[in-house]
């Protein structure tokens, strides 16, 4: 029997997998043509998106979710991004889901302290 995950469950799984470094699960959640735009860059397609997630994943310590709002196929997650190199960053992530996969991601946060810690 096949079960279909809800948009909320897909979002929850995305953040849990990213925090755990489970990039195979992330690959299954992302559409092949996923489009990502964030404070640190952009990515077109699943390979570029995974590369970006892996890059930030090297310093990721914890994702502390404060709220998740779902409306139709859209979900906004408000969280603190804890890294090993900068103070926690309050972050908003909007994702759009189609046919059980994340097709678009937009992320916003103040990247100044993280960029400074990265020497950029």
Q: Residues of each region from the PLM?
A:
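Charged catalytic carboxylate motif
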Residues: 6-10, 48, 74
């Amino acid at each position: 029997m096949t079960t279909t995950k809800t948009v909320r469950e897909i979002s929850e799984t995305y953040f849990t997998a990213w925090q755990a470094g489970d990039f195979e699960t992330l690959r299954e959640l992302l559409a092949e043509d996923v489009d990502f735009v964030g404070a640190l860059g952009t990515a077109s397609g699943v390979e570029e998106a995974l590369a970006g997630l892996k890059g930030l994943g090297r310093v990721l310590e914890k994702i502390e979710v404060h709220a998740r709002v779902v409306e139709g196929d859209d979900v906004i997650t408000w969280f603190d991004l804890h890294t090993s190199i900068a103070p926690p960053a309050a972050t908003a992530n909007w994702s759009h889901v189609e046919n059980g996969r994340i097709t678009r991601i937009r992320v916003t946060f103040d990247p100044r302290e993280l960029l400074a810690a990265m020497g950029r």
